[in-house]
């Protein structure tokens, strides 16, 4: 077997490679490594000139590997001896199956694997096949590679993984076109009503002891906002009757590390904002930067005496205004179709789920996952059924449902 990915890492790591295949006029080969210090350093080096989504950034991948410590691999595709695509994956056991997925699980949304921008101009779905052959050869225990919530494109370049056999993700993603600045955004989204509500909220918050919007600029501020956010989410998930996807202590440490370490980098690729009223945090958002797109990765409000004043809406108003002032072109609310997002959004993004079975068991699992996604899509696209589902879920709040049911 030829080591076609030596240029990916010059430290001499051994890679398991797939049988070379023709890709245009060049030879495409692939390699797979355990995600260790050397391969993660090589991944970071490749990302310096690559295009990728926030959840595939070197920072996200490194902190997830170090803090959550899953079973992980880094797979690379090279064309003509030059790396063009890198997949950082974690492997999880689901019953009798092993599934490889993007690091971060359900926290990884709007996914776009690290890829060479020049290669993306001509890349096609079949060109990625050697990558999955290599994964199957290196890790025959993996049944399915589940690449979920894929962005169809990023910065005008098509996602090569979206060309794989895929289906629509059950959850829609919503975003705001910021063209023309904040005034233009308001003019397109009931701006008069929004301004009136914002003024009313301002008066309520001032009478409740004053308010301030926080932009976490120190590790201490990061930790303070995250502690508050996790408490808000814990309360809400318990009330809704679903498992808390932020409940794992290692996942919480991951986010603390991710946002605190991001402060050391130019432009802070991950940022926290909060709204404090009367000396108490009432709303928190966590965002990532993807070129000229700001992505709200998560948010929560304190369900207390001021919840009726919609502190979350107030914070989004200020966040979107600042995002416009900073010259971004899109404010992305990420996954989930909710009324508070619809008040702003004029862009719908349909993510894709690509399932690549590597074993006979994997084919069976992929078929079940596709069927499950179809059922979820039907439920969530049927307002009456979805409303009934959420009502039943709240009534069974003492019996935790899987987080995937959200």
What is each model feature region?
Residues 2-4, 114-158, 162, 216-217, ...:
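Intrinsically disordered, low-complexity, positively biased terminal segments
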Residues 2-27, 152-184, 189, 293, ...:
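Active-site/acyl-donor-binding loops of N-acyltransferases
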Residues 25-102, 149-173, 181, 186-308, ...:
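A conserved beta-strand-loop-helix scaffold within acyl/acetyltransferase catalytic domains
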Residues 36, 54, 121-124, 191-194, ...:
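Intrinsic-disorder-associated interaction segments
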Residues 72, 92-169, 290-349:
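Acyl-donor binding region in acyl/amide transferases
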Residues 86-90, 124-145, 192-210, 229, ...:
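A broadly tuned preference for mixed-charge, low-complexity surface segments
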Residues 104, 128-130, 188-195, 369-374:
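Short intrinsically disordered coil segments
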Residues 110-115, 120-125, 180-186, 209-213, ...:
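Low-complexity, flexible helical/coil segments
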């Amino acid at each position: 077997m030829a080591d076609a990915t030596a240029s990916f890492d010059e430290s001499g790591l051994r890679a398991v490679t797939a049988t070379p295949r023709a890709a245009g006029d060049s030879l495409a080969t692939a390699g797979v490594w355990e995600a260790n210090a050397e391969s993660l350093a090589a991944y970071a080096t490749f990302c310096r000139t690559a295009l990728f989504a926030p959840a595939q950034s070197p920072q996200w991948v490194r902190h997830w590997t170090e803090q959550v410590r899953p079973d992980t691999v880094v797979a690379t595709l090279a064309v003509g001896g030059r790396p063009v695509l890198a997949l950082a994956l974690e492997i999880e056991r689901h019953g009798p199956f092993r599934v490889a997925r993007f690091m971060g699980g359900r926290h990884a949304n709007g996914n776009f694997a690290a890829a060479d921008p020049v290669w993306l101009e001509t890349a096609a779905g079949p060109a990625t096949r050697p990558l999955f052959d290599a994964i199957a050869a290196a890790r025959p225990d993996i049944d399915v590679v589940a690449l979920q919530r894929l962005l169809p494109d990023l910065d005008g370049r098509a996602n090569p993984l979206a060309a794989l056999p895929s289906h629509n993700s059950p959850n829609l993603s919503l975003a705001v076109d910021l063209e023309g600045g904040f005034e233009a955004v308001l003019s397109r989204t009931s701006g008069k009503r929004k301004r009136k509500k914002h003024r009313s909220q301002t008066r309520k918050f001032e009478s409740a002891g004053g308010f301030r919007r926080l932009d976490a600029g120190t590790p201490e501020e990061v930790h303070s906002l995250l502690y508050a956010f996790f408490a808000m989410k814990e309360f809400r998930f318990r009330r809704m009757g679903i498992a808390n996807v932020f409940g794992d202590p290692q996942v919480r440490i991951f986010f603390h590390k991710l946002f605190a370490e991001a402060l050391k980098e130019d432009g802070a690729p991950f940022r926290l904002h909060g709204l404090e009223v009367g000396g108490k945090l009432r709303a928190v958002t966590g965002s990532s930067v993807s070129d000229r797109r700001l992505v709200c990765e998560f948010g929560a409000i304190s369900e207390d005496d001021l919840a009726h004043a919609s502190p979350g809406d107030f914070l989004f108003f200020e966040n979107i205004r600042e995002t416009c002032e900073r010259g971004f072109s899109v404010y992305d609310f990420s996954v989930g179709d909710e009324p508070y997002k619809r008040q702003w959004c004029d862009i719908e993004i349909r993510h894709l789920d690509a399932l690549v079975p590597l074993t006979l068991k994997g084919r069976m699992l992929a078929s079940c996952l596709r069927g499950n996604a179809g059922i979820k899509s039907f439920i969530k696209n049927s307002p009456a059924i979805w409303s009934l589902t959420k009502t039943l879920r709240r009534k069974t709040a003492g019996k935790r449902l899987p987080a995937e049911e959200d």
